[in-house]
């Protein structure tokens, strides 16, 4: 069964006031079976724009992720952040299809993964397809694995583009290197003028720093 993901993007105006939300939500997350994949690590917005804080949280299914958002526990925590932040909050279904073919010598795995979080509005679907075909090689070369590519989604707060893609890499360095590689940049040229993209590269969550 495909996983489900919370992807909130936030701008926090009052960190001290926001902390009460964090404390309550984090305590509940420790009991609800979800897994925090990314929050608070190194990050680089490589295309478009993103809010200042970005979170990637995994649930066992899309339905569970939606139910968690509407749960009594989160409904009590949620209002605590509203006066102190602006948020675009997306819940999206995970991907369970074929993955890029891995290279013979992919990048070494690091203790913390790296992720791409991309939000896309495709303006020319037919001419966008060559980009999809061309990105498979660099994704395989750098050990990428799709977590999200299409699937059901719900925008719970704010706004978001029509498509979301999340890729997991063996490390933050591998995620950045893939984007900057000649092979990926050659693929990216193929989508220029065919899509509007906001793309973030973010380091996996490090529990030792939180």
Language model regions located:
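Terminal low-complexity interaction tails
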Residues: 188-190, 205-206
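Broad structural signal for hydrophobic residues in well-ordered alpha-helices, predominantly aliphatic
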Residues: 28, 80-81, 190-191
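A common structural junction motif
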Residues: 73-79, 183-189
């Amino acid at each position: 069964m495909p996983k489900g993901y919370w992807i909130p993007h936030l701008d926090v105006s009052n960190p001290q006031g926001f902390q009460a939300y964090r404390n309550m939500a984090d305590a509940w997350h420790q009991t609800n079976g979800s897994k925090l994949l990314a929050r608070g690590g190194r990050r680089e917005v490589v295309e478009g724009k993103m809010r200042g804080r970005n979170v990637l949280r995994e649930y066992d299914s899309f339905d569970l992720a939606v139910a968690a958002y509407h749960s009594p526990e989160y409904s009590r925590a949620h209002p605590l952040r509203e006066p102190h932040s602006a948020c675009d909050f997306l819940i999206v279904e995970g991907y369970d299809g074929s993955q890029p073919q891995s290279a013979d010598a992919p990048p070494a795995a690091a203790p913390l993964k790296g992720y791409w979080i991309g939000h896309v509005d495709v303006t020319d679907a037919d001419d966008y397809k060559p980009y999809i075909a061309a990105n498979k090689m660099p994704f395989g070369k750098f050990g990428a694995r799709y977590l999200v590519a299409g699937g059901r989604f719900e925008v719970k707060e704010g706004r978001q583009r029509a498509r979301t893609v999340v890729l997991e890499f063996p490390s933050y360095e591998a995620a950045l290197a893939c984007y900057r590689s000649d092979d990926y940049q050659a693929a990216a040229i193929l989508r220029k003028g065919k899509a509007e993209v906001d793309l973030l590269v973010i380091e996996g969550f490090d529990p030792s720093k939180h």
